[in-house]
Amino acid sequence: MNSLSIFFIVVATAAVCLLFIQSYSIYENYGNIKEFNATHAAFEYSKSIGGTPALDRRVQDVNDTISDVKQKWRCVVYPGNGFVSASIFGFQAEVGPNNTRSIRKFNTMRQCIDFTFSDVINIDIYNPCIAPNINNTECQFLKSVL
């Protein structure tokens, strides 16, 4: 063996040792890692402490400019009726005759996501928590998913 092959063997051995050390460190701290992720999951897409938005700029969506977690739009399972798009502002709505509003419901999660995060600019919102209907079931559901 010449000195060059010995050098590469030493470098490869050191790299494998570092890989094993990192793997063992993750294995030993896996419980702490899961606890940290669970604690900070709500801040996943919010602005970081440094003020730099932690955003995926490849795709523009309605949540890109919002830093408050409760204001972000999300698709949630609506009891017995599929999926709805909700945020602290209310639900995305369908406007019926006489300008009545009802919650827009989707059959699948994919339909909800596609509609909620599409390029539609003019979206109607129905907030069931505005007086006089503060104690209705729709308002209670909205509060429970936020």
UniProtKB/Swiss-Prot annotation:
The keyword Disulfide bond applies. Residues 22-146 are virion surface. The chain crosses the membrane at residues 1-21. Keywords: Disulfide bond, Fusion of virus membrane with host membrane, Late protein, Membrane, Phosphoprotein, Signal-anchor, Transmembrane, Transmembrane helix, Viral envelope protein, Viral penetration into host cytoplasm, Virion, Virus entry into host cell. It is a single-pass type III membrane protein. Contains two intramolecular disulfide bonds. They are created by the viral disulfide bond formation pathway, a poxvirus-specific pathway that operates on the cytoplasmic side of the MV membranes. InterPro entries: Poxvirus_A28 (IPR007664). Belongs to the orthopoxvirus OPG155 protein family. This is Envelope protein OPG155.
